[in-house]
Curated annotation (Swiss-Prot):
Gene, per the UniProt record: PPP1R14A
GO MF: protein serine/threonine phosphatase inhibitor activity
Function: Inhibitor of PPP1CA. Has over 1000-fold higher inhibitory activity when phosphorylated, creating a molecular switch for regulating the phosphorylation status of PPP1CA substrates and smooth muscle contraction.
Family membership noted in the UniProt record: Belongs to the PP1 inhibitor family.
InterPro entries the record matches: CPI-17 (IPR008025), CPI-17_sf (IPR036658)
The protein, known as: Protein phosphatase 1 regulatory subunit 14A
Basic residues: bias regions: 1-11
Length: 147
């Protein structure tokens, strides 16, 4: 009888949900370890993007010194990364900087070089649900706007 109780106790500990959890109380220690590796990678990538964004801001301030009102609101890295070629990216950047009275060629070439080391962040910019063109961007925003 005591052996049966001991057997039940050992069996219940083995089947206990707390035993099925990995370190830190999360299910499966291997899964948690994999998640940490992913987080480290994402942090490094995000830091690189942040560095490029700071560089862009600094260079725009130099290029538009004395003409701050003409400075573009932003140069969206994800929009540039979505473009197929460097030529398209270059044209897009030139279009954004058309109001600048200073030479922008060096800035464009440096930015294109910095973009080569970056990857699009799918969570930061979602493609439009109506990418097939059935709705205008304004209609799409109105349809997907949160109440």
């Amino acid at each position: 009888m005591a052996a049966q109780r001991l057997g039940k106790r050992v069996l219940s500990k083995l089947q206990s949900p707390s035993r099925a959890r990995g370190p830190g109380g999360s299910p499966g220690g291997l899964q948690k370890r994999h998640a940490r590796v992913t987080v480290k990678y994402d942090r490094r990538e995000l830091q690189r993007r942040l560095d490029v964004e700071k560089w862009i801001d600094g260079r725009l301030e130099e290029l538009y010194r004395g003409m701050e009102a003409d400075m573009p609101d932003e140069i969206n890295i994800d929009e540039l990364l979505e473009l197929e070629s460097e030529e398209e990216r270059s044209r897009k950047i030139q279009g954004l900087l058309k109001s600048c009275g200073k030479p922008v060629e060096d800035f464009i070439q440096e930015l294109l070089a910095k973009l080569q080391g970056l990857h699009r962040q799918p969570g930061l910019r979602q493609p439009s649900p109506s990418h097939d063109g059935s709705l205008s961007p304004l209609q799409d925003r109105a349809r997907t706007a949160h109440p």
